From Swiss-Prot:
Coiled coil: none annotated. This is Aromatic dipeptide epimerase. Belongs to the mandelate racemase/muconate lactonizing enzyme family. The keyword Nucleotide-binding does not apply. It is an enzyme of class 5 (isomerase). The keyword NAD does not apply. Has epimerase activity with a variety of hydrophobic dipeptides (in vitro). Enzyme activity is highest with L-Phe-L-Tyr, but is still relatively low, suggesting that L-Phe-L-Tyr is not the physiological substrate. Part of a large, functionally divergent protein family. Protein modeling and substrate docking were used to predict the substrate specificity, prior to biochemical analysis. Mg(2+) binds at residues 191, 219, 244. Its cofactor is Mg(2+). It comes from Herpetosiphon aurantiacus (strain ATCC 23779 / DSM 785 / 114-95).
Length: 356
């Protein structure tokens, strides 16, 4: 059978960043990711990327590589056309190794769509071939924040995402003021990365409203386990609230919809894998929740995969696929073409990323 999986390999790739990617819970200076290759019996090669982010998920490059090695036995000799059945087997075998499973699923789907000469965005629904991404200002002082905002606008990117720590509301507000003054037309997505409690989150939102700071989304202000607090902030803040760390599975999204924990779901494939991500999207859309597409610190490979999913499926209100802009060196060619904030997908087989 030409679509039988014949070979699988995993290779550590260490991608230097242009600046440390800092969030409230930690920072990275190098993206310690894993390149995954799946080869079919007809010679078709699919590429995937696993991007563990220890500060968020606890997963590491070493652990991810080991998980991929263990999972190979579930896939070798299997028909990639049954990828969702294979994804379920991977989830059952290594549920906690989400990045490893995601990298394998990406590589399988890239191989499948390359075999059939189909663009990945067509496979996911063909709704669109274009997205508009934001760019992130990582944690730092007011001077860094203002300079970063000006640099983002100079790139032609219109929306800005801001990482805040949540510990000192006055400090977070000072940074937002500096960003707003430097980029007065830019809508702001504020990512709290679980750093606030209810009192600080509501005080922060009240101040943003009083000062007319254009925050269009407040992402995961509270810790994952504070479901009641997230619901309170969603109900009382007056702003759209996104669940990121709180939305790691389809079950989580169902609970969010039932309990009013958030109004937007941030889909990051590295949190759950591709098959589970599609379930999360379906539940969110059925429940009337907004959608955001994001990622860990990923190269053009994984980001292009996510872009194909978001554009092909449609319905995503917030696009946060900017981490390739922070990667100084990588071994890839192809992927989405970026002009300003516009990401344009090509009509090529698979996700369009190849090894240089």
């Amino acid at each position: 059978m030409p679509t039988t999986i014949q070979a699988i390999s995993a290779e550590a790739i260490n991608l230097p960043l242009t600046e440390p990617f800092a969030i409230a819970s930690g920072a990275q200076a190098v993206a310690a990711n894993v390149l995954v290759k799946v080869q079919l019996a007809d010679g078709t090669l699919g590429l995937g990327e696993a991007a563990p982010f220890p500060a968020v998920s606890g997963e590491t490059q070493t652990g991810t590589s080991a998980a991929i090695e263990r999972l190979q036995s579930h896939l070798l000799g299997a028909d990639v056309r049954g990828w969702r059945k294979l994804a379920a087997m991977l989830d059952h075998a290594e549920h906690e190794a989400a990045a490893a499973r995601c990298g394998l699923e990406m590589a399988m789907l890239d191989a499948l769509t390359r075999h059939y000469h189909m663009p990945l965005h067509v496979f996911f629904g063909g709704v669109s071939k274009q997205l508009e991404t934001d760019m992130t200002i990582t944690a730092g002082d007011e001077v860094h924040a203002a300079a970063s905002a000006k640099a983002i606008l100079a790139r032609g990117i219109k929306s800005i995402k801001v990482k805040t720590a949540g510990v000192d509301v006055a400090y977070d507000l000072a940074r937002l003021r500096a960003i707003h003054q430097a980029a007065p037309t830019a809508p702001l997505i504020v990512d709290g990365n679980c750093g606030y409690d209810v009192e600080r989150a509501l005080a922060f939102c009240a101040a943003c409203k009083a000062e007319s700071i254009p925050m269009v989304l407040f992402e995961q202000p509270l810790p994952r386990e504070d479901w009641a607090g997230m619901a309170q902030v969603t109900a009382q803040s007056g702003f759209a609230v996104a669940a990121d760390e709180s939305a790691r599975s389809a079950h989580d999204v169902l609970r969010i919809a039932r309990e009013g924990t958030a109004s937007v779901i941030n889909i990051k494939l590295m949190k759950a894998g591709v098959a589970e991500g599609l379930k999360m999207i379906a539940i969110a859309q059925a429940a009337g929740l907004g959608l955001m597409i994001g990622g860990m610190v990923e190269s053009i490979l994984a980001m292009s995969f996510s872009a194909n999913l978001a554009a092909g499926n449609g319905g995503f209100d917030f696009i946060d696929l900017d981490t390739p802009l922070f990667i100084a060196e990588h071994p890839f060619i192809g992927g989405f073409a970026q002009t300003g904030g516009t990401l344009q997908l090509a009509d090529v087989a698979g996700h369009g990323v190849n090894l240089a």
